[in-house]
Amino acid sequence: MSKPETPAAANFLRPIVQADLESGKHAKIVTRFPPEPNGYLHIGHAKSICLNFGLAQEFGGECNLRFDDTNPAKEDQEYIDAIKSDVRWLGFQWAGEERYASSYFDQLYDWAIHLIEAGKAYVCDLSPDEAREYRGSLTEPGRNSPYRERSVEENLDLFARMRAGEFPDGARALRAKIDMAAPNMNLRDPILYRIRHAHHHQTGDKWCIYPSYDFTHGQSDAIEGITHSICTLEFEDHRPLYEWFLDNLPVPCRPRQYEFARLNLNYTITSKRKLKQLVDEGHVGGWDDPRMSTLSGYRRRGYTPASIRAFCDMIGVNRAGGVVDIGMLEFAIREDLDANAARAMCVLKPLKVVITNYPQGRVESLELPRHPKQDMGVRVLPFSREIYIDAGDFEETPPAGYKRLIPGGEVRLRGSYVIRADEAIKDEAGNIVELRCSYDENTLGKNPEGRKVKGVIHWVPLEGSIKCEVRLYDRLFKVANPEKSEEGGSFLDNINSGSLVVLTGCRAEPSLANARPEERFQFEREGYFCADLKDSRPGAPVFNRTVTLRDSWGQ
């Protein structure tokens, strides 16, 4: 696609931060990125990372990495390690050590007691189903819990016994006492603590009660001195509760919450629950499968940190929602790799060519530039009597407009000579297994005399080329909105069965023999590829297609 028409890095938060600093409201900006460690980061998180770390960098502030680890049943150290790796890979470093909401559990417990003593929190014995019924709906007010008027002394006693482990999971909960008739349902006596007898990856078995996200979020911001607490729009209705807690607790500072529109990318799913389902049910090879929308998946596919940062800059930051075309992300990586990826040749479907009039035993060393514009040096290809071309570059009965090799026709070999197809050798089934060609020895680096050769094809030497595996990745979903499915179906019905094609027996030029994991190339005429982070080995490389040379989706 051509360069997308987008505002120049629109960001409604930038003037807010600038004004706060200029007015002296804040001496320094402090932001935070607070993921829950219950899955791998995805492309939507990249927008939040670039926003929070980017604002801090731009205005000379700091950004904390804080793990919102209040739900031990779904969290794991694997996710913590992956998140830290992904943030660093994107090019950012958090202030000091990483932080954990669980580090504040003692303080949060004390603040819960503060609310109980102030008559603003109570222990409720309603079951989850009963509490849901009492809560009401958007059109009907809720009803007060029958346990709402317990005395301060009884609530303190029950809360202490909750912590001591006397009650089973779900038997009781600590709730804030706000307003069961509030139009904003988040203010209808929200839960502060639940009983969960679960081992925690940071605190072990110290706690059997865990604070809710809403109770943890703002107070963690206050403890860390966050000035601008930036989250996505679905938390806009939670802001009154965020502020209620700050109003009613002796917090050391008062952060402010701002909301922006989350990233919605077509042909993509970013629900961590559904991404986990794809992994658990074997639809993909793992969280870092190159078809996944996870940052580790994009990394393994060959996306660069710079391309993802550029994409996030292109789409900007605003409060209006909408769906972003995945073509913008693909545009960003094409721009990056076109400028920075070394060129190489790889034949995906090798067809042997014998150049019958080329001298037996002769080998020429041909120098080809590693990049057409940047000074990256040259790579050397041996040229001799036998080479490989791609089977798709020869047609006995070509369609209209075909400019590659045909019987009696000529093409130029990239960086080499003009050859003519003289004879096609077939096996018993009629498949072409070899071409006999002749070359024009006067066409190295110049056009043939008296005729024009339009087609140029890539090639590799038969001797010296390396065998490799090439994985052709495409979009995991075949429809723009994979969440939408037929009645009774699921998003899994929209999986693109052609999202991965594995080609073995490909032949690559010698310079690719020792490609480093994650090293990126443009395979001339084929697309942009990278050596696989996990499976590629010296002498046995595996290349993943990052993106095609141009947007050909649906064509």
Swiss-Prot record:
* Motif position, 'KMSKS' region: 269-273
Gene Ontology CC annotations of this record: cytosol
Q: Does the keyword Nucleotide-binding apply?
A: yes
Give any GO molecular function from the UniProt entry: glutamine-tRNA ligase activity
Residues annotated for ATP binding in this entry: E36, P37, N38, H42, I43, G44, H45, A46, K47, S48, T232, R262, L263
> Which GO BP terms apply?
glutaminyl-tRNA aminoacylation; glutamyl-tRNA aminoacylation
E.C. code: 6.1.1.18
**What are the record keywords, sorted?**
Aminoacyl-tRNA synthetase, ATP-binding, Cytoplasm, Ligase, Nucleotide-binding, Protein biosynthesis
Q: Which residues form the signal peptide?
A: none
Residue positions binding L-glutamine? D68, Y213
- UniProt-listed InterPro entries: aa-tRNA-synth_I_CS, Gln-tRNA-synth, Gln/Glu-tRNA_Ligase, Gln_tRNA_ligase_bac, Glu/Gln-tRNA-synth, Glu/Gln-tRNA-synth_Ib_cat-dom, Glu/Gln-tRNA-synth_Ib_codon-bd, Rbsml_bL25/Gln-tRNA_synth_N
Any keyword Protein transport? no
Subcellular compartments: Cytoplasm
What the entry lists under Gene3D superfamilies is as follows: HUPs, Ribosomal Protein L25, Chain P
Q: What is its main location?
A: cytoplasm
Q: Which PANTHER family match?
A: GLUTAMATE--TRNA LIGASE (PTHR43097:SF5), GLUTAMINE-TRNA LIGASE (PTHR43097)
Q: How does it assemble?
A: Monomer.
Can you tell me which family this protein belongs to? Belongs to the class-I aminoacyl-tRNA synthetase family.
Q: What is this protein identified as?
A: Glutamine--tRNA ligase
Which species is listed as the source?
A: Azotobacter vinelandii (strain DJ / ATCC BAA-1303)
